[in-house]
UniProtKB/Swiss-Prot annotation:
Residues forming coiled coils: 65-89
Keyword Coiled coil: yes
Chain segments carrying region Disordered: 81-112
GO cellular-component term (any): virion component
Domain of life: Viruses
Subcellular location: Virion
This protein's name: Uncharacterized protein R463
Keyword terms, alphabetized: Coiled coil, Virion
Length: 293
């Protein structure tokens, strides 16, 4: 027990508290009861000629002693807590490492031997089948081993499986692996892509013959200076040259077949339109082939 205490100003060099502390060091069982007499029959200590000076203390002095002892007690309790936390953390880390090792052993070990990337075997069949670096085809995919546990239990993807893959609940969202299957048959597409040229945003190279065919004669090309350019004329040229829509035919005063770039007649409803928009010839059934002749 510390007998020299840093007292506050009003309790400095208080002999009462010092006497009380000296008396406490005699009473409290520390180092097998020093400075005490023991009877022959009993092992319990007997303090002789001890006048208790603690009872002479003021209320203020007693509260100070209480706070002092409480402070020491709290410090020791905190030290005990820290040591207990360290031991608990060590045991928790050991158990966590064991569980992590168990879960890692369940999963397949990829590159377990730490060999370089160039020596890891890859599936060359995927490169042959999929030369444009798309995904693996749907039929070659394997259901994940923990599919039953993880089914609809993922925060990022409600299905876990990609839409269109084998285990997916819906295949109409859109397939991840887009490739042309030559063994598919039947019409897949009802609309055709745009046949017309896209508008040219580059600096124009004017073709006088084409402009004359389109009856555009506002400004001759050879008389137009390079540094001064008429915005209105060029915008009209842009409209008449590179945009051909049905509402603008009266501007260009030229008639042409909108379907001349297609390899078949799109208004023939009996023709098979393949998914990749390429003609493969033939009609759907023998009856339609007969009434075609």
């Amino acid at each position: 027990m510390n007998q020299s205490i840093n007292f506050p100003n009003n309790l400095q060099n208080n002999s009462n508290i010092n006497n009380a502390l000296k008396y406490l060091t005699k009473i409290i069982p520390n180092n097998k009861y020093p400075q005490q007499n023991q009877s022959h029959n009993n092992t319990t200590p007997v303090v002789t000629n001890a006048i208790n000076p603690i009872e002479k203390l003021n209320v203020e002095e007693i509260t100070y002693l209480q706070k002092y002892l409480e402070n020491i007690k709290n410090k020791k309790l905190n030290l005990n807590k820290q040591s207990n936390n360290q031991t608990n953390n060590q045991t928790n880390n050991q158990t966590n490492n064991q569980t992590n090792n168990q879960t890692n052993n369940i999963r397949p070990q990829i590159n377990n031997n730490k060999q370089p990337i160039s020596k890891i075997q890859t599936n060359r069949t995927n490169e042959i089948y999929d030369p444009l670096k798309r995904e693996m085809p749907i039929d070659w995919r394997i259901l994940p081993a923990n599919s039953l546990n993880n089914f609809r239990n993922n925060a990022f993807d409600a299905n876990v499986f990609e839409p269109g893959s084998r285990g997916a609940t819906s295949t109409r969202i859109g397939k991840k692996a887009q490739f042309n299957n030559p063994y598919d048959y039947g019409s897949k597409q009802n609309s055709f892509e745009n046949v017309f040229q896209k508008p040219c945003n580059d600096p124009y190279v004017y073709d006088n013959n084409m402009l004359n065919q389109l009856n555009i004669n506002e400004v001759p090309n050879n008389l137009r200076p390079n540094d001064l350019r008429n915005v209105d004329v060029e915008s009209s040229l842009l409209q008449r040259e590179s945009v051909h829509l049905p509402g603008q035919r009266n501007i260009s005063e030229r008639e042409f077949n909108r379907w001349n770039m297609l390899p078949f007649d799109p208004q023939d409803h009996r023709h098979i339109v393949w998914e990749d928009n390429m003609p493969r010839g033939g009609y759907a059934t023998r009856a339609e082939r007969l009434d075609d002749n």
